[in-house]
Amino acid sequence: MSEKRKSNKIIGIDLGTTNSCVSVMEGGQPKVIASSEGTRTTPSIVAFKGGETLVGIPAKRQAVTNPEKTLASTKRFIGRKFSEVESEIKTVPYKVAPNSKGDAVFDVEQKLYTPEEIGAQILMKMKETAEAYLGETVTEAVITVPAYFNDSQRASTKDAGRIAGLDVKRIIPEPTAAALAYGIDKEGDKKIAVFDLGGGTFDISILEIGDGVFEVLSTNGDTHLGGDDFDGVIINWMLDEFKKQEGIDLSKDNMALQRLKDAAEKAKIELSGVSSTEINQPFITIDANGPKHLALTLTRAQFEHLASSLIERTKQPCAQALKDAKLSASDIDDVLLVGGMSRMPAVQAVVKEIFGKEPNKGVNPDEVVAIGAAIQGGVLGGEVKDVLLLDVIPLSLGIETLGGVMTPLVERNTTIPTQKKQIFSTAADNQPAVTIVVLQGERPMAKDNKEIGRFDLTDIPPAPRGHPQIEVTFDIDANGILHVSAKDAASGREQKIRIEASSGLKEDEIQQMIRDAELHKEEDKQRKEASDVKNEADGMIFRAEKAVKDYHDKIPAELVKEIEEHIEKVRQAIKEDASTTAIKAASDELSTHMQKIGEAMQAQSASAAASSAANAQGGPNINSEDLKKHSFSTRPPAGGSASSTDNIEDADVEIVDKPE
């Protein structure tokens, strides 16, 4: 089979906490691509079962029976240390552990998987979805991230793309992508707010759009607030109610928790459209008295009360974003709702309260981010003209200086790409080296901000304190990823660093993960081929047994025996888990013998036809006078030859008078 040709398309991928989506520019318009399961979004879930890796819907289907090996909402762990994810660990049934570097990783049967590897599995699924639609190999993508993702999380997302076999041309914030999708065909200048409440994160961005220019004025958010947290309040309510009713604590039962998670998500979605919903989970557990069933009614009002503190947490970031943009709520022309949680009526009511206007519901909150990513892909690929995207960094970047102080070099909401330089010096006489500690955050003291990297500038010539001139340069690319350099003016000595993800993936580790991903891809392909061959063999057995049953009396006994023997050979090959080649060979042999049934039936039909023809020619004589008394036309007998009908004409009709 010939390999697919390489596509020149840059696809857009929304790598979401709960669901992911892929889009591509086609004929100048963005198109969301449906998955092989027929859905326009794919659950961001990866599961390990029986040596197989399942992604998307197949992974979600088996989550209830395999909770410890089903990894969902892994985006909340990407680019983060184990010490930073304590609250997230409590909400998932799988095991999260620290690796040797203190990074948060997933422990599945003693094998550790990084969040980048799991993200790569989801990205591969998106890549394959696009390739199946385009009929071409896709190698380039624009991937979206929450606007409030820090440098480490952005770098980790880019690494996940590389592991998936993608050249990530740009990382762009989700609200910015949504604004692109909304404003690409709009005329005139507008100031818009993008309120993005997704599965795991909350972002608010203020943009000014007009004449093809999309300028982000400010951004803010909460990377610990999303749909998972709303599910959590329903789960906790169900646990409390069940404990009151039955005296049983389900919180330690992972299988029951996974069922409650699914039920909570379903109830949450339903309550956006109805005022109450029934939650029924039969046989949720069992005790000495027998099985127990969970049956509860949750009203919209109850849910809004349970989630009120979560909804309240969206207000402060919105106020800060407006303040940073130097705008008031009345200056905003339109508010876009993005993310599945923005469908909740109480959330929409808060948006109206904050901005003083009804939010715009004209975009699909599940697809608009992927559409915007595809448009940005079109811009980078030259397919979309006259569009300029000016993004910002979400958090200030700086270094630690004397006294443990954070000295910012690049303030938050600075437009990127950008470069900033500042001169620093030594703190002691004859200091031979300085350690550059790179920080991200808004607090005045270094220890209260996030350290995202460090490096040493050595061999500084001896000099009194304060004399050496050390120029520190912060260079931020269009992806929001930071490169730092430090140069000693006297010696010309320079040291550079690209800020790696806090997950600490080195280049050799990334390359190994790329190789592993390719290996698993080939293994999965072989497993699918083996499964297809077994399924085909099973089908062949069924068809053969049916044919033998239906035609047992019409085919030779020795052929019946041969077919039954070959049926048994195929069945045995499947049972013994023989090689794909062996099963296929046995199946092909059975297929060959199945053809003999048709041959035997044809031979029998030919014999019957010959016998019928002989009877037609040598049968009893019919008096022609008698024939004339019938009012019908004669036709050749079945199986009769053409020559036997040469002299037969339509019979004349004779009217016979009725006796009086």
From Swiss-Prot:
Region Disordered, residue ranges: 608-660
Triggers of expression: By stress conditions e.g. heat shock.
CDD domains attached to this UniProt entry: ASKHA_NBD_HSP70_DnaK-like (cd10234)
GO terms (BP aspect): chaperone cofactor-dependent protein refolding; protein refolding
Cited Pfam families: HSP70 (PF00012)
InterPro entries associated with the record: ATPase_NBD, Chaperone_DnaK, Heat_shock_70_CS, HSP70_C_sf, HSP70_peptide-bd_sf, Hsp_70_fam
Residues with the Phosphothreonine modification: 201
Impact upon substituting residue 593 to R: In strain: L2 and E/UW-5/Cx
Bias type Low complexity, positions: 608-617
Gene3D superfamilies: 1.20.1270.10, 3.30.420.40, Actin, Chain A, domain 4, Substrate Binding Domain Of DNAk, Chain A, domain 1
Keywords annotated in UniProt: ATP-binding, Chaperone, Nucleotide-binding, Phosphoprotein, Stress response
NCBIfam families reported in the protein's UniProt record: PRK00290.1, prok_dnaK
Other observations noted: Expressed early during infection.
Family, per entry: Belongs to the heat shock protein 70 family.
Alphabetized PANTHER family for the sequence: HEAT SHOCK PROTEIN 70KDA
Stated role: Acts as a chaperone.
Protein name: Chaperone protein DnaK
Name of the gene encoding the protein in the UniProt record: dnaK
